[in-house]
Curated annotation (Swiss-Prot):
Source organism superkingdom: Bacteria
Descriptive protein name: Ribosomal RNA small subunit methyltransferase H
Enzyme class: transferase
Family under the similarity heading: Belongs to the methyltransferase superfamily. RsmH family.
GO cellular component: cytoplasm
Subcellular compartments: Cytoplasm
NCBIfam families associated with the record: 16S rRNA (cytosine(1402)-N(4))-methyltransferase RsmH
Reaction catalyzed: cytidine(1402) in 16S rRNA + S-adenosyl-L-methionine = N(4)-methylcytidine(1402) in 16S rRNA + S-adenosyl-L-homocysteine + H(+)
Organism per entry: Dehalococcoides mccartyi (strain ATCC BAA-2100 / JCM 16839 / KCTC 5957 / BAV1)
Gene3D superfamilies: Putative methyltransferase TM0872, insert domain, Vaccinia Virus protein VP39
Region (Disordered): 328-349
PANTHER family reported for this sequence: 12S RRNA N4-METHYLCYTIDINE METHYLTRANSFERASE, S-ADENOSYL-METHYLTRANSFERASE MRAW
InterPro entries xrefs: RsmH, SAM-dep_MeTrfase_MraW_recog, SAM-dependent_MTases_sf
Keyword tRNA-binding among UniProt keywords: no
């Protein structure tokens, strides 16, 4: 039996949040090692379909082996989820019953030394999700001026010592490795302040900037929303406050009617609710899961459901609506096992 390097976070909660039904059509925007994808395929059997996306080609290779028994029920696409709508249109894969985002780094990305995501071991300052991207962490560290560096570390890392760190980097550069940079940051702030390493927030900021994570998330949420059929579910797992804030604010905006500024006496926006927030309070991992998988401790899950706007037609048949509504009421699905041959893989365009 093959052991996979990444443990899927809040797996049961993800399946319940998506309301997976037999014969449903789903998208996993963050394939990783394929743990969530595998569970979606099992629970949507018989007749379920899954499109799984990852910018990292090594994730596609690993997951293809894991999911090969599901055959043509799953389509693996090497692309960025910022291109979600184009991908679904390309493969005529719309509308869908549910879309999952499990944001942040997978364990295998953290543990892959050459990617430079971790400062625990010496590695080049890379931090790209895909080797096709041009900008690296080294480009930022060695090329940005002090003000640009300080602003970036504050904006994406919420680092209170951002100015001090930026000045120290400018004085000591060029930097080539993760350990060199982490040591310089630790010296700049005078050692640890709290339970996390002094370089943690700066490394987060660099990774977000290199991969344009926040702008891609904002774009992908809107695209995902438009791909959902009536009753379709959008599930997002985030790992830091910047991501969670974007998801929370998007869900709140789309779940209410008028979004005109408060100083306008009469509505002129004509905005209608198109999402229903399923969990008013954020869902977090259980103590048992955190003890089993410490990397899940910062995870937060939010779930929303697509509702029909006035004048909009239904995407799914009445039978599919019944299945979605049943899952919405009961929160349960039947577990099935699918056995097929030959996973379909596609590269990005």
């Amino acid at each position: 039996m093959i052991e996979y390097p990444h443990i899927p976070v809040m797996l049961e909660e993800s399946i319940q949040g998506l309301g997976v039904i037999p014969g449903g059509r789903y998208v996993d925007c963050t394939l990783g090692a394929g743990g969530h994808s595998e569970a979606i395929l099992e629970h949507s059997y018989p007749g379920g379909q899954l499109l799984s996306i990852d910018a990292d080609p090594s994730a596609i290779t690993l997951a293809a082996e894991r999911l090969k028994s599901f055959g043509s029920s799953v389509l693996l696409v090497n692309d960025n989820f910022a291109n979600l709508k184009d991908i679904c249109q390309r493969y005529e894969y719309m509308p869908v019953h549910g879309i999952l985002f499990d944001l942040g780094l997978s364990s295998m990305q953290l543990d892959r030394q050459e990617s430079g995501f971790s400062f625990q071991t010496e590695a080049p300052l890379d931090m790209r999700f895909s080797p096709e991207q041009e900008l690296t962490a080294a480009d930022i560290i060695n090329g940005y001026d002090v003000t640009e560096l300080s602003d970036l570390i504050w904006k994406y890392g919420e680092e209170p010592f951002s100015r001090r760190i930026a000045r120290a980097i400018a004085e000591k550069r060029p930097f080539k490795t993760t350990t060199e940079l982490a040591a310089a940051i630790e010296r700049a702030v005078g050692g640890r302040h709290g339970r996390i390493h002094p370089a943690t927030r700066t490394f987060q900021a660099l990774r977000i900037a290199v991969n344009e994570e926040l702008s891609h998330l904002e774009s992908a949420l809107s695209q995902a929303h438009s791909l959902l059929g009536h009753g379709g579910r959008l599930v997002v797992i985030s790992y830091h406050s910047l991501e969670d804030r974007i998801v929370k604010q998007y869900f709140q905006k789309e779940a209410k009617g008028c979004i005109c500024p408060d100083d306008i006496p009469q509505c002129v926006c004509d905005h209608q609710p198109s999402l229903r927030i399923i969990n008013r309070r954020v869902i977090t991992p259980s103590d048992e899961e955190i003890s089993r998988n410490p990397r899940s401790r910062s995870a937060k899950m939010r779930v929303a459901e697509r509702i029909i706007e006035p004048g909009e037609g239904r995407f799914f048949s009445s039978r599919e609506d019944e299945l979605v509504n049943h899952v919405s009421r009961t929160g349960s699905v039947q577990h099935g096992q699918a056995k097929h041959k030959g996973v379909v893989q596609r590269g990005g365009s």
